[in-house]
Regions:
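Accessory RNA-recognition modules of RNA-modification enzymes
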Residues: 1-188
Length: 188
């Protein structure tokens, strides 16, 4: 006489490219190395590994990541150094609707340097993507902590939200919305 019935564990319907949100960090792969954009090296607070082949995200996100990294590499832009509290580039936050294919791009920087981001916007919009970029934002974050937060958000293109459908329900997803990062697994 059990109060519940155990159905077991169900896997995600897709194994790769399932995340609808990723936060990438700017940094260097080793001390004084070239600019990198990706994820923290295992066991390291400071070293950032380029993630040109991250299996967690849709290939659209990878194309955007590479475009953004190359744009700032060409301009020799600095990344934010947490201990010294100096530098410009902090994070790249990407959101992509699994059902809609709509994409939000958020470049998070400090105010310590200034760059014309219009050429970046044009390069991003010209990328051959499966989905569609519906918004590009420049988020200003001058806080000392290493979190993605907004002191100010500038919309460079489009809108700051997209819609996602989950179990027949329509959700409006914005930059800082809390939403299941694996939409399809939530439907299982």
């Amino acid at each position: 006489d059990r109060l519940y019935h155990w159905d077991g564990i169900y896997g995600s319907p897709i194994e790769f490219g399932y995340r609808n949100k990723m936060e990438f960090s700017f940094g260097d792969e080793y001390k004084d190395g070239p600019l990198s954009l990706g994820l923290h090296k295992k066991g390291s607070t400071y070293d950032i590994l380029n993630t040109d082949d991250c299996k967690l995200v849709h290939p659209d996100m990878t194309k955007i990541l590479v475009c953004v990294r190359e744009f700032f590499l060409e301009r020799n832009a600095s990344f934010y150094k947490k201990l010294q509290h100096v530098g410009y580039l902090r994070h790249l936050l990407l959101r992509r609707g699994v059902t809609s294919g709509e994409i939000l791009v958020h470049v998070v920087t400090t105010t310590q340097e200034e760059y014309d981001l219009e050429p970046l916007k044009e390069q991003l919009l010209a990328l051959p993507l499966e989905g569609k970029i519906v918004g590009i934002m420049h988020i200003i974050n001058d806080s000392l902590s290493d979190v993605v937060q907004s002191d100010e958000t500038r919309i460079l293109y489009g809108q700051d939200f997209f819609y996602e459908t989950l179990l027949g329900l329509r959700f409006k997803i914005s930059t800082f919305s809390f939403f299941q990062p694996n939409s399809l697994a939530a439907e299982v």
